[in-house]
Structures are given as structure tokens and as C-alpha cells.
């Protein structure tokens, strides 16, 4: 059996800028500044806990657990407020999920919290399409560690080598490849030069078909 595992932010949902805006505002309240370019270059691959911890360390600050948890709750609340402004799925997301879901079991492996993902999917009538969702709160190690993809493949009942991951970042690709998946890179957050480790690169989910997935799993990507 073959399967497809999606990243979420930057692949199905146009939420990377919303995550950045929420993080920027949380950090600004602490007197810190983070540009979008720096976020993309250095922090996009982390889950929230890793991102805030590493950023604080770059400022010479070690956060105790209480302070870190407070900042994470603040960022989560700000992100929810940004999300409330409207629909965030890419136009090609639902058709792609329908197309691939008719051929393969689907899962999500993401650095976002599972509840955030499920709320967006439910609001767009897509929650039923995914057999498994692995969020940041489901793993001990975030991307680029392979744990999230390992857990997603296990939940689907497939070996990692029988699955294709769709990712938008170098860290996500590293995570999927480390778990043993074939990979499709999508240029929503980075250009092709940032996705050189992908087995195949697309500019839109419109280009991702069951035939492409089968081709990659046959080793012909």
C-alpha cells in the first residue's frame, strides 16, 4: 500500500505569514525584533517551542519552563486571532486532497499544534480526508528530526519507503528523507534552490497527481 503525507503550513494552508505575525508580536512584547526574512532563513523549520527557545538563546536569554509556556500560549492566542480573519487554505488544496485521497490514504505531519490543524480542516470540510494527523504536540522531537513522519507512516500502517511527503521547506524535506520517504517540494515558501533535496519540485498542488506519486515510489522521479 502507498500513502501520501502532507506538511500543513505552506503546503495545504497559507499560514506561514500568520505564524510569523503571531510570533513577531509575541516577541515584540518582550522587547525583541524578528524580521520575516530572518524567520524564513533560520526559524521556519522549528515548531513553536523550538523556535522561541532558539530565538531567546540567540538573544542571550535562557527561558525557564514557566516563561516559555507563557510565551507559547501568547503566540497560540495571537495566531488564533489572525486565523479568525478568514479562510487560509490554498485554492489548490481541496482538489489535491480529493484527487490523492481517492487513490491513497492520507496523513499530515506538521510542526503546528494538532488542534490548530484540525480546526482549519474542519472549517473547510476536509478533516475526514485524513486518516492521521501528527502535530507538534504529538512528538518529542520536531522537524528536521524524522519523528513526525515516522509516526504518521506508522499511523497509516505503511512503511516510510511506501509514502511520499509534500513539503515546503528544507527542514521538512530533511525530516521526511530522514524517515525514508520520497519527497515533493513545493515552492510556496522557498524557490527551487532551497528545495534541492526534494525528489521532485512543483509550484502548485495542481501539479501533484496520483500518477506522479506512483512514479516517485517506483523510483522514476
Model-derived features: where do they sit?
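Asp-based, Mg2+/Mn2+-dependent phosphohydrolase catalytic module
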Residues: 1-2, 113-221
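Anion (oxyanion) recognition and catalysis
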Residues: 28, 100-101, 177
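An amphipathic alpha-helix signature
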Residues: 20, 24, 48-53, 72, ...
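Helix-loop "lid/cap" segments that line or gate small-molecule binding pockets
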Residues: 26-27, 47-63, 120, 153
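Active-site neighborhood of HAD-like aspartate-dependent phosphohydrolases
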Residues: 1-41
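Metal-dependent phosphoesterase signature
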Residues: 57-95
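Short, acidic loop-to-helix structural element flanking the phosphoryl-transfer center
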Residues: 81-108, 114, 118
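Helix N-cap/coil-helix junction residues
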Residues: 32-34, 61, 126, 157-158
Amino acid at each position: 500500500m502507498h500513502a501520501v503525507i502532507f506538511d500543513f503550513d505552506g503546503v495545504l494552508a497559507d499560514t506561514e505569514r500568520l505564524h510569523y505575525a503571531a510570533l513577531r508580536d509575541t516577541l515584540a512584547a518582550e522587547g525583541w525584533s524578528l524580521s520575516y526574512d530572518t524567520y524564513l532563513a533560520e526559524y521556519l523549520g522549528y515548531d513553536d517551542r523550538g523556535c522561541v527557545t532558539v530565538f531567546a538563546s540567540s538573544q542571550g536569554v535562557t527561558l525557564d519552563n514557566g516563561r516559555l509556556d507563557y510565551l507559547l500560549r501568547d503566540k497560540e492566542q495571537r495566531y488564533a486571532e489572525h486565523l479568525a480573519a478568514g479562510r487560509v487554505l490554498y485554492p489548490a488544496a481541496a482538489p489535491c486532497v480529493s484527487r490523492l485521497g481517492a487513490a491513497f490514504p492520507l496523513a499530515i505531519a506538521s510542526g503546528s499544534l494538532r488542534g490548530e490543524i484540525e480546526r482549519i480542516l474542519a472549517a473547510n470540510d476536509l478533516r475526514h480526508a485524513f486518516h492521521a494527523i501528527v502535530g507538534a504536540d504529538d512528538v518529542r522531537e520536531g522537524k528536521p528530526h524524522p519523528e513526525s513522519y515516522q509516526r504518521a507512516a506508522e499511523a497509516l500502517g505503511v512503511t516510510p519507503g511506501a509514502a511520499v511527503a509534500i513539503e515546503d521547506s528544507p527542514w521538512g524535506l530533511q525530516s521526511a528523507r530522514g524517515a525514508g520517504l520520497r519527497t515533493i517540494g513545493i515552492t510556496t515558501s522557498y524557490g527551487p534552490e532551497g528545495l534541492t533535496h526534494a525528489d521532485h519540485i512543483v509550484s502548485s498542488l495542481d501539479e501533484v497527481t496520483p500518477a506522479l506519486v506512483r512514479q516517485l515510489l517506483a523510483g522514476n522521479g
